[in-house]
Each structure stands twice: as C-alpha cells, then as structure tokens.
C-alpha cells in the first residue's frame, strides 16, 4: 500500500506554487512599504509559551495544539499561531532596547492546528502576519488594519469588509467580565461543557462559542461597549476616525471578541462577502495585546497585529474569479538534433542560464517534433535549434514562438543576443 499525505495537509505542486510565490512576494512588498521587517521563528516552541501567551481557556490550547515530549522529556508544541513566538523572540532578543520603536515585524510561515479539515481550513496552513510592538498610538491600530485592507485590494478583492470592536483596557474588561458572569451564571447549566468551564476563567469566550451561539441569552448579553471607560472609549473613537481618514470602511460589531485571550482595546476581522463562498467568511483577524509582552517575561510593552490564512485568501480569489498575473513560461528551450549537438546544447543552455534566463533542454533523446511539443507545454518564448549543420556553420537557429519568425545567430554571441531580446 502506498503512503499518502496526512489528513488536513496538502501538496502544493508546480503550476500552483507560483500563485503562492506571487502572494508571498506581494506580502513582502507591502510590508516593505510600511517598514515592517521579516522575522523567522522556530516551527516548534516550548508548550508553556502558548499556555501563557495564547491562553489556557482557548480552543487552540485545549483542543488543537500538536504537542509532544522530546527525548529530553521537554514539552514542545508545533506553533499554532505566530504572535506568541514573535513576542517571545522580541523579549528574548531584547528588541525593546532598540532606539527605533515601535518594532515592526512580519512573518510568513507554517502553522499547525488539529482541526476538522474543511474547505480553506487545514491542519498545516500558512499564515502571513504582522506585529507592531512598542506603541499605544491609535494610529498604529489604524495602520495595521489599513495594511491588511490594502493588501487584499492589491490582490484584486472587492467584496471584503472590516468588522471592528473594542474590548477596552484591563479595567473595562474586568467590569464587562463581572457583568457577563452575572448574566450567564443563573442558566449556565443550559450551555455546553466548554462554556461552563469558561464562566469563571474567561466568560468573554462564551460569546465566541459556536455550539451555543443561538441561545437566547447570547442576544441579551451585556455589550462591552457599555463598559468601556472614558479612556477606552476615546481610544476606540480615535481608531475609527483614523480609518475613515484612510478611506478604510468598517462596521462596528460589539459581539466581536476573537478567539485568543491576549486581546485588549482594538479587535477586528476582515471578511469576504463574495457570492462564491455561499456565506460571509473570515479571511483574517487581529487586535491589540497590551499585556502579552509582560506575560511572556518582558517589560510592559503594548502591541498590535493581525494574521491571515493564505489558503483562505486563495479561496477568496477563486470566489471572485480573480486571475493574478503569474508567469508560467520559460525564456528559451534548446532543441538538440544528433549526438554531436547534445553536448554543445548543454553548453548553450548553461550560457543562457548564466546570462540570467530561464532555460530548459531535452534529456531524453526525443525527436525534434517531440522537443517542440515540450517547448510549447513550457510556454517557451524562444526555441534554439542546434543540429550538426548549425554546428558546422557556427550558428544557432532561433525561433520566436510568439511571431513564428526565425533567424540565424552566431554561436559565440548567442546568449547575450537572446538576453538583449528579452530585456
């Protein structure tokens, strides 16, 4: 029996991987424009990082982490999200001592969660995320959201919307927490076991429950906006003003809480309303985490960020029938005819590659017709034909595959000649 790919994973094959490369390239470009620098953290971390950083009441920690004991009996976990590892690196490498604050970082990498595989949701998936650590300015909140929206617009997506909320500062959250406990406690037995355990630990997570979302108490639960103190309300209002100035439309949703424990103040999600999805689908989300750096062992430093699934983005592109400008062609295919020409063809291909061109040649001793078919399949812009007659004359026959025009080019200047034609 053949060995197959594990459930919840996928092979990204040639022909498809170019789409991923294009998206990742665009992500890096927009981060360059906003002055975010790339960071790469380990794929696995100490489990304690996620217990403290993500929160032990979250579904990620309780149900979805891939954790294991190594041979030194240390508990390690494949990273389920990117923020906690970035903050750990920020603290461990004392980036908070840099003169230029805030520290603005981005990452593109594999994450792992044990979830039920479904469309756009895998157990191994790729996230693009950014983190801005070291500023309490509402302008950085607006910038993070604007960057995400501009990235999606740059991909051609039109049917997206930003959903916004504020969870307030620590005092506002505590007041709201007390109100939620008072609201749910008399009838908590009617809720799922997860919600019952969340009541004392983190009642805000009850609002995010998928099982009990239609319970009548959900619709009458106290809203966080009723408990925002003056400072939190002013901060939230300022973020909205800045987004409006930046031409970033948004909707306010007082029930948006996000699934991680570290959020304070601004939280947001970006959703697709494309008809191809059949239902409104979350593409990305993020928010402010003012206590996370301290929780992981660093100084009191505010931060904000977001993460998006590349898999979900690709689904959104398909839902809106968007074709990205991806290059699937090669510059030149070298056709060799006869034994004598084979070695020279290898040298021609080498010289063309050295000149910076993408080149392929035949390695199976196929006839000329079969080699031209290969050139067509590879969408070669030019075909170079080298046979014994061409060798005797010291030339190569060059065919432009777009126009059909052919010309003879001297062998000793061939690579530079083709390179100039392609500039």
UniProtKB/Swiss-Prot annotation:
GO terms for molecular function: ATP binding; catalytic activity, acting on a protein; histidine-tRNA ligase activity; transferase activity. Keywords: Aminoacyl-tRNA synthetase, ATP-binding, Cytoplasm, Ligase, Nucleotide-binding, Protein biosynthesis. InterPro entries: aa-tRNA-synth_II, aa-tRNA-synth_II/BPL/LPL, Anticodon-bd, Anticodon-bd_dom_sf, His-tRNA-ligase, HisRS-like_core, HisRS/HisZ, HisRS_anticodon. GO terms for biological process: histidyl-tRNA aminoacylation. Gene3D superfamilies: Anticodon-binding domain (3.40.50.800), Bira Bifunctional Protein, Domain 2 (3.30.930.10). It catalyses: tRNA(His) + L-histidine + ATP = L-histidyl-tRNA(His) + AMP + diphosphate + H(+). The keyword Protein biosynthesis applies. The keyword Cytoplasm applies. It is found in: Cytoplasm. Pfam families: HGTP_anticodon, tRNA-synt_His. GO terms for cellular component: cytoplasm. Its EC number is 6.1.1.21. Belongs to the class-II aminoacyl-tRNA synthetase family. Homodimer. This is Histidine--tRNA ligase 2.
């Amino acid at each position: 029996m053949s060995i197959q790919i594990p459930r919840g994973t996928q092979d990204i094959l040639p022909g498809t991987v170019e789409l991923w490369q294009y998206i990742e390239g665009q992500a890096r470009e927009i981060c360059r424009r906003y002055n975010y620098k790339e960071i790469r953290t380990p794929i696995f971390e100490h489990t304690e990082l996620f217990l403290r950083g993500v929160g032990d009441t979250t579904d990620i920690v309780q149900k979805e982490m891939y954790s294991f004991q190594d041979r030194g009996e240390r508990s390690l976990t494949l990273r389920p999200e990117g923020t906690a590892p970035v903050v750990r690196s920020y603290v461990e490498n004392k980036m908070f001592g840099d003169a230029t604050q805030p520290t603005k970082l981005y990452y593109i990498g594999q994450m792992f969660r044990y979830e039920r595989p479904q469309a756009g949701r895998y157990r191994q998936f790729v996230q693009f995320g950014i983190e801005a650590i070291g500023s309490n300015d509402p302008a950085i909140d607006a910038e993070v959201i604007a960057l995400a929206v501009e990235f999606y617009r740059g991909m051609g997506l039109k049917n997206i919307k930003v959903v916004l909320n504020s969870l307030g500062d620590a005092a506002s959250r505590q007041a709201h927490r007390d109100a939620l406990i008072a609201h749910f406690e008399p009838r908590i037995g009617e809720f799922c076991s997860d919600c019952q355990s969340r009541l004392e630990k983190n009642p805000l997570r009850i609002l995010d429950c998928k099982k009990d979302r239609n319970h009548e108490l959900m619709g009458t639960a106290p809203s966080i906006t009723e408990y925002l103190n003056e400072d939190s309300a002013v901060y939230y209002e300022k973020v909205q003003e800045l987004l409006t100035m930046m031409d970033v439309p948004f909707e306010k949703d007082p029930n948006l809480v996000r699934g991680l424990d570290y959020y304070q103040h601004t939280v947001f999600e970006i959703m697709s309303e494309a008809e191809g999805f059949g239902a409104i689908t979350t593409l990305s989300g993020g928010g402010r985490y003012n206590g996370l750096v301290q929780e992981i062992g660093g100084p009191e430093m505010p931060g904000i960020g977001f993460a998006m699934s590349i898999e979900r983005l690709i689904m959104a592109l398909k839902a809106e029938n968007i074709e990205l400008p991806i290059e699937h062609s090669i510059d030149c295919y070298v056709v060799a005819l006869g034994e004598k020409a084979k070695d020279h063809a290898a040298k021609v291909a080498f010289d063309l590659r050295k000149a910076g061109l993408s080149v392929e040649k035949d390695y199976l001793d196929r006839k000329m017709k079969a080699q031209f078919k290969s050139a067509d399949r590879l969408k070669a812009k030019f075909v170079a034909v080298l046979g014994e007659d061409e060798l005797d004359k010291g030339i190569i026959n060059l065919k432009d595959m777009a126009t059909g025009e052919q010309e003879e080019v001297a062998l000793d200047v061939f690579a530079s000649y083709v390179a100039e034609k392609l500039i």
